[in-house]
Amino acid sequence: MTSAVDGLKQRFMAMSQPDADGVYRNGAAKRKARTGLAMGNLTQLWNEACEAVSFDVPATGIGLGAVGSLARGQVGPSSDLDLAVIYEPHALTDQQLNELANKLWYPIWDSGLDLDQSVRTVAQCEAVTDRDLPAAMGWLDVVPIAGDTGLIESTAVSILERWRKAARKRLPELLGSAKSRLDEFGRMAYINQPDIKEARGGLRDSVLVSALAASWLADRPHGTYDDAVERLLDVRDCIHLVAGKDTNMLLSPYQAKVAAMLGLADPTLPDGEREAKSIDDLQTLLARVGRQIAFSLDSTASRAEHSLTHDKPRFAFFQVFQPRGGGKRQAPTFDVIAPGVAKHEEEIVLAPGAEPAADSNLVLRVAVAAAEYGLPIAPGTLRNLKKCPIGDRNWTDESRELFIRLLASGPALLNVWEDIDFIDVPGKLIPEWLGVRNRPSASAAHRYTIDRHMVEVVTRLGRETPSGGRYDDRHYEALLLAGILHDIG
């Protein structure tokens, strides 16, 4: 017996094909079209299921909702469907619920589509999102498909309200989940075969940005951030098309074909050279969008944490009647730790009076402070440091000393280097760095890109010699410089 979802998987693939020249274009429009097709077919499937069961399905008290990428309008060519039947207690018996669910799920499975399904009461939906952070992230975007759409909408509102009330307590858990994923999957910008969903700067981070914005603790970024997310979704779509399945792993066998679909293959180059360069360009694209998404998460999280530190009424209107300290706002305190550099609320910031545009070494002093104190650079500070007049021909005794101190900071160097690389500092100090930046390694044994490999090497260089002695200052400086430059040229 045919169903509304028969052939849906094939239609997803057919409507997702690249243009005649092999380039995948208009990704956002294609995602919208796939989502619309899925929602329409699922509405029909609900009607078919209601007609096929041995009882009358009530018009109220039960409905079908979309969760995850389907709810966000981000369906890929091979994405699974994340669906939930939501019902009120006593709307149907357990036996009736099971019969209705089978009439929904089996046609989807038979069509070849992957399915993540659940059947829950409103209270169970709320309970799951209260205790399960990954589930909460997906359920913040619940949208109705069919049945009692009002019930689905009210459930979505309830989940969102509960998230906002609990967000202050759950913020550390949310940020901790991002740290755990970073430890497990690494940074997308530096991985030769990244998981573009779970790696730092991947699609999962964009979901966290939306969750932080939904909490009302911080506004979400727009503009270049939205462009980065859409471009990464284009990459995901191309992976689906090349792999022919639902995967977020950009494996080596896929990379040249994905790069070509993204329009990165230069037709004027010989085949071998064209393929190698397109893979390099693909890695550069991933690094750019991944850094933008990661920076957006960091800056949104920083604003959210700041709002927790400065808990005050949401609207200034109320402050008229509840003035603080005699109506005067307390001035922020800065612990100045280097010229132009200060600690403020567990972040490294610019000290009052600092002038980035007139201080070429300020960015290195900030980087050294962040590494040696083990504190992050405030996102606003990082943006201001773009004004520093950095060059490769104006090295001074101070800049050389600061650079060596930064290289000698051990594992703390990794995050700090990523921060300053986001604003192109290494390439301005060492132009040759741009030749290896974001480039994948030719060796399958290497997990990281060439630039990340060199930074990793430096973090492991201590003062102890292979024979058990200790390097003096001059030899240790030479070792650190050799480490950060050893693959250049």
Identify the residue ranges that each predicted region occupies:
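Active-site nucleotide-donor binding segment shared across nucleotidyl transfer reactions
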Residues: R25, A29-K30, M39-D94, N98
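Conserved catalytic core of two-metal-ion nucleotidyltransferases
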Residues: G36-T43, A49, D56, Q95-G150
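Divalent metal-dependent catalytic cores for phosphoryl transfer on phosphate-bearing substrates
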Residues: Q74-L81, V85-E99, G244, A260, ...
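A cross-family structural signal marking well-folded subdomains
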Residues: H240, S307-G427, R439
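Secondary-structure capping and boundary motifs in well-ordered enzyme cores
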Residues: I62, A66-V67, G73-P77, E198-D205, ...
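Conserved nucleotidyltransferase catalytic core and NTase-mimicking acidic/glycine-rich helix/loop elements
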Residues: T2, S16, W163-L308, R474-H475
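Acidic/His-rich, divalent-metal-binding segments that scaffold phosphate/diphosphate chemistry
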Residues: T2-G22, N26-A33, L37-S54, T381-G489
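Extended, Lys/Arg-enriched charged tracts that mediate electrostatic binding to polyanionic substrates
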Residues: M39-L64, D94, A294-K343
